[in-house]
């Protein structure tokens, strides 16, 4: 009788754990997947502008899955581009990861004159040299998936965490980023950005 009750207790605990896991990870992921499948656009349209005799390219707007194809087309059409200006509120993490891959592959420098926030920072960190204007801001927070902040969920935040670790972001800085709820923004000053080696140079804008 004792072992039967223990078995029942284990089943109940496992069921509760499954329900909690589904509600904290499964549902947000399902929502995000549905949004991708239906191609629901949540962010401002992405635009590009050529600068400095076609040696620089400005990316502004929201980042979506597929933005990487737009960037690649611009770089193929204008092979002298060496510097990518970023002015974005962020967007989908998968789109940002793919954009970062292209920036690395093409060995581009990155530059922020005004603000690069959220997923945009993943793209910025892919630059060989990472420049920022004297009034430029990099704004960080934990990722959001399916309308849910991942700041208190290690499983959901793993993708963003991996990107930052691969970019060489130090632990103290990363912990601050991942502890910032998705609805908030942490904007470190240039001294902190230098200390963390996020930026390589502050330039006149």
What are these regions (language model features)?
Residues 30-70:
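STAS-typified acidic loop motif
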């Amino acid at each position: 009788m004792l072992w039967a009750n223990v078995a029942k207790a284990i089943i109940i605990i496992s069921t509760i754990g499954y329900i909690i896991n589904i509600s904290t990870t499964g549902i947000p992921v399902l929502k995000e997947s549905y949004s991708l499948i239906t191609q629901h656009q949540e962010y401002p349209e992405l635009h590009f502008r050529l600068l400095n005799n076609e040696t620089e390219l400005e990316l502004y707007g929201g980042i979506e899955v597929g933005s990487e194809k737009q960037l690649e087309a611009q770089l193929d059409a204008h092979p002298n581009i060496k510097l990518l200006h970023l002015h974005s509120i962020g967007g989908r993490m998968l789109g940002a990861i793919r954009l970062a891959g292209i920036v690395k592959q093409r060995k581009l420098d990155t530059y922020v004159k005004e603000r690069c926030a959220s997923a945009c920072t993943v793209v910025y960190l892919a630059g060989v040299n990472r420049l920022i204007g004297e009034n430029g801001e990099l704004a960080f927070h934990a990722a959001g998936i399916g309308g849910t902040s991942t700041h208190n969920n290690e499983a959901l935040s793993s993708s963003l965490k991996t990107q930052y670790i691969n970019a060489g972001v130090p632990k103290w800085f990363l912990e601050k980023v991942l502890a910032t709820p998705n609805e908030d923004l942490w904007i470190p000053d240039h001294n902190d950005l230098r200390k963390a080696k996020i930026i390589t140079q502050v330039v006149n804008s």
